[in-house]
């Protein structure tokens, strides 16, 4: 699972960097907030998840796959919602809100994984 998190992190970084280049070339910065979500929540969070799952082998069971799917969906839905909203389309506003909620659920799942596996990993 750690390797999948690392690869996902790299994909988010590449997409965010592509958005940054596009914004710079066009002088159109409406995608800025979506780019930040992709860098911070996509690249940063998935890199942290991967590092944790690689370091704490006991965390590789249980909720980890579910957490990955929830976190992935949350980042994508929030970024798409932010971009659509910033481009003036109110249709995307619920996606931004729902995506942020899903991201928060992903963080709660990660916290549960961390606190549930901490004792197990410490006693190996």
Region spans (language model):
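Hydrophobic alpha-helical transmembrane segments of multi-pass integral membrane proteins
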Residues: 1-124
